[in-house]
Amino acid sequence: MNTKHRYITGFDGIRTIAVLGVIFYHLFPNTIKGGYLGVPVFFVISGYLIIDLLRQEWESNQKIHLKAFYFRRIKRLYPALIGLLVLCASYITLFQRNLLNNLRGVVFSSLLYFNNYWQIDNKLSYFDRFHNPDPFTHLWSLSVEAQNYLVLPILLVLFYKLGRKKDRVAGIFLLGSLASAIWMAIQFKPGVDPTAVYDGTFSRSFSMWLGASLAIFYQVIIYAQVFLKKPKKR
């Protein structure tokens, strides 16, 4: 079987729509009220691509090189992150000096990918865009993504080494996604700032876990189709 990593061109269009949705949501929050849904769309795609890539590696080598995977993630994410931090730090130094007090915490938490919980702990509201403008607000999503990049591959390797069948692995990821979504619903309280729910890893991981589940389910369906197309012996 050819395990070469597939480039799915359709994802580019979905990503573009998701980006535009988020941008227009922040520009016109009272008009484009559902634009923030671009974030979970991104998470689903990320979860799908990561697990699909690792699944192909396992099927090709019966092994997943986690160290190499994490090195590739760091190599890909850190240059852009550092560039963003430098640009934003320069901006607030010139135009928003009132934010300098939090700069060290922002940089430290962003580089170690726990910025979402740093924002929650410091009571920084994601939705208070008028009274608390902050160019670092959106770094919470990168932290959620990176935390799942750490956990999902380890779980996939563990499930494979335990001999779990693909449909069961997909089912476990799907159950994790449902648990995260249920936790979000439980934690949400009308009339209370939902930043802790919106930024929290446990309540926002459902999208990436759903993508991970779909990556495995898709392959199960492909295998089933191939099996059904085989000519039956007489």
Regions of interest found by a model, annotated:
Residues 1-234:
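Membrane-interface helix/loop caps of multi-pass membrane proteins
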